[in-house]
Amino acid sequence: SMLSNNILVADGAFPGDDFCIQMEGGVLDSDYNNLVARNGAWIGNREGNWERLLYWQRASGEDVHSLSHDPLFADEAGWDLHLKSSTGRYLNGVWTNDGAGNHSPAIDAGVPWFSHTNEPSPNGGRVNIGAYGNTPQASKSRTNAWLLAMTMNDGGVLKGTNNLLRWSAGNLGTTDLVRIEYSANGGPWTTVANNLSAVPGEYVWDTTTCTSSLQVLWRVVLQTNAAVQD
């Protein structure tokens, strides 16, 4: 089975809603989703139950380009699953803006080669994840440069020499450069690597050279404008 461009939210507060992906058998091809586990729910099961996207990726080999971010639905409790957008969201036949701090990470995060031509402009040149991707009601894209850190957004542990960090980018190209930074305690930031291409958005991190901590954070920063970061 193929599973892509979906937002799957599992909430352990509701009986029977314990997994974003619960495998009973067969073959799964899953990627470019947004998987969110709340209140003790699990991302997926493969040789065990996995509460973090990173652990599910390692155990299953699936969802390597997927997210685990708050999808920022317009009104989740009211079942309005349009994505909040700083540039335009469909609401009862008209368009509204949600402000700069309310832009869904699922916008422009779908399968890169899937069609997006039914989405209104600006559409970022990439389909949105979720129910309204590639439809006239798709939430609109940002027109400024942006970065989104993907790896470990929902937590987890990285150790050793071969840890792949992933991020996504918009309105940036291969000549735009970024740097990777980390903080051991949420305080000062230390540069791990610089002069990396903003796209395709991957870096192998050797964590043995860094201070070990349970509070480590990492971020990706645009070198020409440090305000563009995540």
What residue ranges belong to the model's regions?
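Extracellular carbohydrate recognition
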Residues: V27, E119-G124, A227-D230
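Flexible loop/turn segments at secondary-structure boundaries
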Residues: W42, D80-L81, S139, W189
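C-terminal accessory segments
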Residues: N34-A37, Y55-A138
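Extracellular beta-rich repeat passengers
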Residues: S1-V64
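Extracytoplasmic/periplasmic beta-strand context in beta-sandwich domains
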Residues: D17-F19, P71, V127, V178, ...
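Low-complexity, Ser/Thr/Pro-rich intrinsically disordered linker/stalk segments at domain junctions
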Residues: T143-D230
